Amino acid sequence: MSTRGYMGIKKKGQLKGQYNHFDSYISGLGKDIIETLNNIPKSERINKLNEVYDNITLVNENDTPTQELIDYAIENELYDGSVSNRSTKDMYCLFRNCQGRLDMYLNGLKYMLNGNDFLNDGLFCEYAYIINLDTNTLDICTCGNHLQLSVDLLSLNYNDIANAMKEY
């Protein structure tokens, strides 16, 4: 069974985030995000994450993709024709392969399928990971947007975080 979640970045109160279909628990998506963040030198981490946020353009799932978006998704190997409507006219298919891939955004990926509504789904959004640039923390939520833990972006230790999250 899939463990659905959310990955996003918050700046000046505004979220840019996406739905993640599987392995969203702390030992899956959570660990990937923490490891990816820890690969950025601490001296550069906050500035780099601000740049990433500023570079992201949200696209909506119900929008009709332009040819530019279709070409971009195919060129960047984001398209997955085995899900949903199996069409390049389906935004979910176009951006399926970047779900949960913070590393892709750190490497310049500029489009993100807007999953912000999913964050408020307390039943189906089991875990959420928000890089909060207003507080310079990684905010970890369960059951939608119920904050459970905030950890300084410059002090991320997976084992400590995993142990703290065991009670949730």
Language-model features and meaning:
Residues 1-3, 125:
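Short, basic and Ser/Thr-rich N-terminal targeting/leader segments
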Residues 3, 24-30, 34, 102:
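Extracellular/luminal recognition modules and glycoprotein regions
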Residues 4-9, 129:
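Short beta-strand scaffold segments in enzyme catalytic cores
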Residues 5, 15-20:
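Short beta-strand segments
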Residues 9-14, 132-135:
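Short acidic-glycine loop/turn motifs at beta-strand connectors
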Residues 18-28, 145:
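Short, solvent-exposed aromatic-acidic interface loops
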Residues 40-168:
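Low-complexity intrinsically disordered segments
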